[in-house]
């Protein structure tokens, strides 16, 4: 099995999650320079800002980087063309089927890596020509599915022949080693990078993550079919309470409209949407992204070596 770094040309078999309103060109470049595949998150951007972020990333790194496109975005068609025009080499996708773009991307030499939350979707996408698939468990922050990473990854590995990347609930070497044991060729991480020095989220957001305990995340929108994992705060608790009471979509929208931007840019930890995975309780300090990635890989490698010695 080829490791992800061999497929992507990176130092480590690690992808930085393309988090909307967070994964800027500068942040993606910092992650790429530190050994991961940095991703620009097109969610929260428009055509002009995406193009600007791609160009800024190019100016800051000579390492591989990519773009994450949420296919439900109203400008997804335009984004699909921009990555071709700007010479992006890797595209990850979520919230939809990338099928109509794949031939265009493949002709441009772009590696296409969808994010899936179920093995059946991975199996459906494989014949379309994808290069790999990210199997993301419900432990992750932001939009989530129902299956845990532990259950999802091996079933996706068994369902498809393309390389599988594990995501959701990965913040240290023990979890990285577990991902490889499940059959993954690499991992995608997001929450653990939110507390990097280079991450552009507000300091209040980082402080909230550092205070978090193991049970301090909650999933909003599960009843309405749009589940999102966030830190518990006034907004998320009230949202869940209203949702359980039968509030309609319009009533609930008043809690979430603009809430991610309030958290990321204004540091509003009361009514902002503090998207974070269940590993938030494992975060203890703000560090350079290079230190986080170096330790993640080295501790994972040592863990795998130790496990090998046990057998």
Label the model's feature ranges:
Residues 1-163:
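Active-site entrance/lid segments in N-terminal catalytic domains of soluble metabolic enzymes
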């Amino acid at each position: 099995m080829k490791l992800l770094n061999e497929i992507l040309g990176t130092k480590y078999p690690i992808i930085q999650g393309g988090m909307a309103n967070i994964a800027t060109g500068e942040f993606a470049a910092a992650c790429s320079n530190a050994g991961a595949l940095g991703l620009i998150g097109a969610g929260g951007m428009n055509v002009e800002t995406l193009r600007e972020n791609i160009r800024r990333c190019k100016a800051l790194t000579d390492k591989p980087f990519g773009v994450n496109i949420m296919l439900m975005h109203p400008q997804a068609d335009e984004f699909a063309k921009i990555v071709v025009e700007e010479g992006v080499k890797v595209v990850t996708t979520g919230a939809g089927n990338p099928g109509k773009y794949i031939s265009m991307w493949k002709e441009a030499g772009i590696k296409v890596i969808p994010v899936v939350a179920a093995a059946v979707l991975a199996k459906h996408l494989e014949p379309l020509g994808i290069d790999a698939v990210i199997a993301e468990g419900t432990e992750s922050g932001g939009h989530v599915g129902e299956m845990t990473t532990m259950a999802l990854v091996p079933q996706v590995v068994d369902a498809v022949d393309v390389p599988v990347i594990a995501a959701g609930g990965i913040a240290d070497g023990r979890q990285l080693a577990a991902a490889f044991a499940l059959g993954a060729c690499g991992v995608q991480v997001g929450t653990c990078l939110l507390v990097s020095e280079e991450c552009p989220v507000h300091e209040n957001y980082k402080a909230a993550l550092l205070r978090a305990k193991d049970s301090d995340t909650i999933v909003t929108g599960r009843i309405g079919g749009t589940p999102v994992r966030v830190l518990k705060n006034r907004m998320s608790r009230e949202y869940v309470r209203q949702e359980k009471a039968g509030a309609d979509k319009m009533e609930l929208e008043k809690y979430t409209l603009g809430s991610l931007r309030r958290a990321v840019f204004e540091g509003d930890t009361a009514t902002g949407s503090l998207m974070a995975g269940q590993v938030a309780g494992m975060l203890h300090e703000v560090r350079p992204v290079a230190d986080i990635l170096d330790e993640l890989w080295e501790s994972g490698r040592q863990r795998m070596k130790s496990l090998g010695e046990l057998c």
